[in-house]
UniProtKB/Swiss-Prot annotation:
UniProt similarity note: Belongs to the metallo-dependent hydrolases superfamily. Adenosine and AMP deaminases family.
Keyword Oxidoreductase attached: no
GO molecular function: adenine deaminase activity; metal ion binding
Protein's UniProt name: Putative adenosine/adenine deaminase
Organism taxonomic ancestry: Bacteria, Pseudomonadati, Verrucomicrobiota, Opitutia, Opitutales
Length: 330
């Protein structure tokens, strides 16, 4: 079996995906072809974002004109999830930006319902909301205080510009949300150093770090993540394009896994990077020399943290075993 066929056949997950940042560019082109030309420079593989604000500006200038109502969330999500199904991705965790509820005056539960309505048969989707660190003390605080009541909300994520300080109240809010059955995540170790990863683990109590790349700068933080059973939901292509790493060969995912840190791979914001989940697996093989067994372990890691029944996890594990043994799963 060719490597490309093996990667396609792997039952995969995506656990780090921003729905606004996953807006399919072809939807924008079909909507306003005069404004969105084919193959813009920022979507080319050799394009590098100079700064996070540079990246954020491009994302917002493309996503905000589109996401103006629930129907647009449905339409985008339907196209996003179709791409997952085509790649044999069977479980997805995706987040919408909480501030959108204020920007377009659309209640969060309506966004959740729109995304949920777009989920096709055979795909498990868990919906999160993400917020800036500063939102904890801003106008969104009343909304944040009600998140535990939102049906269909799997969890929350702290994202955006990592240089912002983490507000002291965040730890208590995250703890309350966990007590209400919500999964808590935090972006850390992307543009901030290993200390931000330690902060997220020790102070916020999360066991899901989005990125985590720069934890490699402090072996003690790597050990902490391994000892606490923390998962790093990593995005190698995003890290390259945003210059978090100088090259894919220097990406630390292999070193993290060798140290006992569970790592997954996802696309982050494919609107900006023009990447797919399969692409992420291919670069692990081509740039970091991952074997098929190691690629399979990455897939297993995604299922280990997936919010699905144990029986489904066992079935998928058996399917991966069959692939590694050279037989075609039934």
């Amino acid at each position: 079996m060719k490597l490309s066929d093996f990667i396609q056949a792997l039952p995969k997950t995506e656990t780090h995906l921003h729905v606004e940042g996953a807006l399919p560019y072809e939807l924008l082109q079909a909507w306003k072809p005069e404004e969105y030309p084919p193959n813009p420079a920022f979507r080319q593989p050799d394009y590098r974002y100079a700064t996070f604000p540079d990246f954020d500006s491009i994302l917002l200038s493309h996503a905000l004109p589109w996401f103006t109502n629930a129907e647009r969330y449905y339409e985008a999500s339907k196209a996003i999830f179709a791409k997952h199904v085509a790649q044999n991705v069977r479980y997805v965790e995706t987040s919408f930006h909480l501030a959108v509820t204020k920007f377009i005056r659309l209640p969060g539960p309506e966004i959740i319902a729109a995304i949920r309505a777009a989920v096709p048969a055979g795909l498990e989707v868990r919906i999160f909301t993400g917020m800036l660190r500063s939102d904890i003390v801003g106008d969104l605080r009343p909304t944040i205080d009600q998140l535990h009541t939102w049906d269909g909300l799997a969890g929350v994520d702290l994202h955006g510009f990592e240089a912002m300080r983490t507000e002291p109240e965040t730890a208590a809010i995250w703890a309350r949300l966990r007590a209400a059955g919500k999964i808590t995540k935090c972006h850390a170790g992307e543009f901030g150093g290993a200390d931000r990863v330690r902060e997220a683990i020790e102070q916020l109590g999360v066991d899901r770090i989005q990125h985590g790349v720069r934890a490699i700068e402090d072996p003690a933080v790597v050990r902490l993540a391994a000892e606490r059973g923390v998962t790093f939901d990593m995005c190698p292509i995003s890290n390259l394009r945003l210059q978090v790493v100088p090259s894919l060969r220097e990406h630390p995912i292999r070193r993290f896994m060798a140290a006992g840190v569970r790592c997954t791979v996802s696309t982050d914001d494919p609107l900006n990077f023009a990447n797919t989940v399969n692409d992420e697996y291919h670069v692990l093989a081509s740039e970091l020399d991952f074997t098929r067994a190691e690629l399979s372990q990455v897939a297993r890691n995604g299922w280990a943290v997936a919010d699905v029944p144990v029986a489904m996890k066992r079935a998928v594990s058996g399917e991966i075993d069959q692939l590694l043994n050279g037989s075609t799963p039934a």
